[in-house]
């Protein structure tokens, strides 16, 4: 990890920073994919024709790392089909036609908490995931702190929100600071054995002075909570970057995050986790920033998860024909093919770009300027990664790829942003990382087959 970490200045474009979230009118129907988290897809437990209520479990988790799915409106299950994912695969999707009542399920009541195990079980049942983009199940992240080989002395609450345009976390801090406070107290009470003496650092960029002031007021009597102000430079929200800038510790590829003595949790994840523990209502809605050059009236909206993106765009309006629609931030969000796609648990923003701003410049040959290395928070040479990927001998290719440090890539796209040749550098790194994962899985499978 280099000393001058996180040094890219990108236009903030936080047009909705002062806009209190507005709850949308109830959509006619919602579409709930089974892959709204990292890990195995959830498995539907309802059938077509079933009547469901808000907060009702409709899909159970499958496998070691998974997350349940709950009904986000009350109504009738009209279809259990499939849809294409942003990564090219398919997943099951449950379609619910709303009855307009938003009637809560009888199961929605605060869980009974007695110890760490019951606390983690409740977080698991809530369906909470990392809402900053990774979508890692929150219970699994917290559970890692129980590893006897780790000593977690710092909990980093990621409130950086460093991507341009997005202000959903900012608004969560302004509207529900008490949920954040409750979340910290739940961790202190039920994970005290594993987080004993831990300091809680709310890591927030300096471009949110109103939120900083409110948080300082909220926690002024809590000596174990620090408001850690960060420079408003990109990519402060990447976990490796935040670890270094908040603690001075360096993340090493291949090691779990708590092995560095820290847990990191998104500020909205923490707040909504607390809301579930207080009320019993699982993750069924979220704040979504809708913005971009083609959006007529940028807004922060509160919408049921599963609402079609087209429903949000009807509210904000468009001032030109969309050239590209991105879910997430402009740096590492995902472009979608259809505005009929639904928002999911991690959909913190919908950005609409007009045809002019959506056109990518034509790529040319690398000029070896070194800007990608200079601006990479972990100092990766993407040009070297590109060359190594073309080596014929697989063993040599794998060894040299590991030596490039590509596994430490944080997917921030800083390299692509600064490349004067407009090369798809992020995609080169992602392809290399995927290749190394496939290779490792194949080697593991071969080893297990040999041992049988």
Task: List each model region and its residues.
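Conserved hydrophobic positions within beta-strands
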Residues: 75-77
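Gly-rich Lys/Arg/Thr-decorated short loops/hinges at beta-loop-alpha junctions or inter-strand turns
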Residues: 130, 155-169, 294
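Ferredoxin-type iron-sulfur electron-transfer modules in oxidoreductases and energy-metabolism complexes
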Residues: 347-363, 373, 377-452
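Hydrophobic alpha-helical hairpins/lids featuring a short glycine-rich hinge
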Residues: 88, 94-157
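Hydrophobic alpha-helical positions that pack around
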Residues: 149, 193-194, 199-309, 315-320
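Short hydrophobic beta/alpha edge segments that flank linear recognition/processing sites
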Residues: 52-66, 81-84, 91-98
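N-terminal, Lys/Arg-enriched amphipathic/low-complexity engagement segments
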Residues: 1-45, 95
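Short histidine-centered loop motifs in beta-beta connectors
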Residues: 42-51, 55
């Amino acid at each position: 990890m280099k000393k001058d970490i996180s040094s890219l200045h990108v236009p903030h474009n936080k047009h909705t920073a002062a806009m209190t979230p507005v709850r949308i009118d109830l959509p006619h129907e919602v579409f709930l994919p089974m892959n709204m988290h990292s890990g195995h897809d959830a498995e539907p437990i309802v059938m077509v024709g079933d009547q469901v209520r808000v907060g009702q479990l409709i899909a159970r988790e499958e496998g070691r790392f998974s997350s349940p799915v709950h009904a986000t409106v009350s109504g009738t299950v009209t279809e259990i089909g499939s849809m294409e994912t942003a990564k090219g695969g398919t997943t099951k999707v449950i379609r619910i036609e709303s009855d307009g009542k938003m009637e809560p399920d009888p199961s929605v009541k605060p869980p009974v908490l007695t110890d760490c195990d019951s606390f983690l079980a409740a977080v698991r049942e809530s369906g909470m995931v990392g809402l900053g983009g990774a979508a890692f199940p929150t219970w699994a992240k917290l559970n890692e702190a129980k590893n006897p080989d780790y000593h977690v002395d710092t909990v980093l609450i990621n409130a950086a929100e460093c991507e341009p345009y997005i202000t959903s976390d900012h608004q969560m801090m302004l509207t529900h600071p008490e949920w954040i406070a409750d979340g910290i107290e739940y961790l202190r009470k039920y994970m005290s054995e594993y987080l004993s003496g831990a300091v809680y650092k709310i890591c927030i960029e300096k471009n949110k002075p109103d939120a900083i002031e409110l948080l300082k007021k909220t926690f002024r009597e809590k000596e174990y909570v620090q408001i850690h102000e960060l420079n408003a430079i990109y990519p402060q929200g990447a976990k490796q970057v935040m670890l270094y800038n908040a603690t001075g510790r360096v993340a090493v590829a291949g090691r779990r995050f708590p092995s560095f003595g820290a847990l990191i949790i998104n500020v909205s994840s923490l707040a909504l986790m607390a809301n579930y523990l207080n009320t019993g209502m699982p993750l069924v809605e979220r704040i979504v920033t809708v913005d971009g050059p083609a959006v007529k009236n940028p807004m922060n909206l509160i919408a049921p998860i599963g609402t079609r993106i087209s429903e949000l765009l009807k509210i904000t309006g468009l001032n030109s024909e969309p050239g590209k629609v991105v879910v997430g931030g402009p740096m590492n969000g995902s472009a979608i093919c259809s505005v009929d796609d639904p928002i999911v648990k991690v959909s913190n923003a919908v950005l609409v770009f007009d045809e002019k701003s959506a056109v990518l410049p034509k790529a040319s040959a690398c000029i070896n300027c070194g800007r990608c290395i200079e601006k990479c928070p972990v100092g990766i040479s993407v040009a070297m990664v590109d060359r190594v990927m073309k080596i014929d001998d697989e063993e040599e290719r794998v060894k040299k790829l590991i030596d490039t440090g590509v596994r430490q890539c944080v997917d921030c796209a800083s390299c692509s942003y600064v490349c004067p040749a407009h090369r798809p550098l992020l995609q080169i790194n992602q392809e290399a990382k995927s290749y190394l994962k496939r290779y490792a899985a194949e080697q593991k499978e071969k080893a297990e087959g040999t041992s049988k």
